[in-house]
Amino acid sequence: MIEKTVTVSTNMEARPAALFVQAASKFQSSVFVKIDDKQINAKSIMGMMSIGILGGQQVTLVADGSDEEAAIAELNKFFAV
């Protein structure tokens, strides 16, 4: 399992969230986004929209599986400043 904490550059609105979920779904690993005490399945559009990610927040990307390193590297691009 790999975890990486990043600072979000902009608000995660509908289109960016959909693109993020599409990217996360390409990986076999389980992928989650953690904010505070919430952990959301990164492959769920409803989950990603409900968590309300805002620019400037710190989130933790979590991946666990055979392609976890590739998943973290790819998904980090959506958040990094």
Where are these regions (language model features)?
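C-terminal structural segments of small proteins and small subunits
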Residues: 49-81
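Compact, glycine-rich, soluble single-domain proteins
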Residues: 5-41, 46, 50-54
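Intrinsic-disorder/low-complexity, polar/charged segments enriched in Ser/Thr/Lys/Arg/Asp/Glu/Gln
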Residues: 1-5, 58-60
